Amino acid sequence: IIDIKKSKYKKEEWNTFLKEGQELTIPAGSEEIVEIDAGEEMTGYLHLLLEAGKGSKIEILQAESYIYDELCGPAQVPLKKDRCDFVNGHLEGYTDEYLAGGFGTEEQAEEYETFWFRTFRFIHLKIKTGEEDLTLKSFYYEETGYPLKIATKVKTSDESLDKIWEISARTLQRCMHETYEDCPYYEQLQYAMDSRVQILY
């Protein structure tokens, strides 16, 4: 958890839920809003397991970074400075919405899974319960991508370049699925020159 916008639970309790599967129960007629940091950009299928909570509305927004209200450039796009700045920035991105059916039990959870992989570094999770308590049993992602064997490495006297190598390898990993793609978050298209550079690795 990078930030709690609105919650009856503390950050430690949310982290225990995410990392260890300790259930959280959200009372009827209440709202929870938290933001989660995956640590790096990921591609994966999101899974949310629920018990009861019929009529609860769940929004899962996926974002690459925090952005600012300030617009820049001729296209007037939101400014990205410190991509982890949750104090001054906010998250914008693609959102999945789910209305809980309420049929999840202690033995057999109701499960929401995305139909296609999602790309994210940050997730804005908003839950608004209806007339029933909702128990969150688990929330995780199943990482996906074409297996990439890192066959080379770069070593220099400048240690700051090690991070650039890691970012480059991770970028390639995140852009390999059924096809090579220019980026996993936006177009997900197979442009000729992007693909050629990727194939050469």
Regions found by a protein language model. Give the residues of each.
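Well-ordered alpha-helical scaffold segments within catalytic/enzyme domains
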Residues: 197-201
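Glycine/proline-enriched, intrinsically flexible loops and inter-domain linkers
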Residues: 186-191
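Extracellular/oxidizing-compartment recognition motifs
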Residues: 1-182, 194
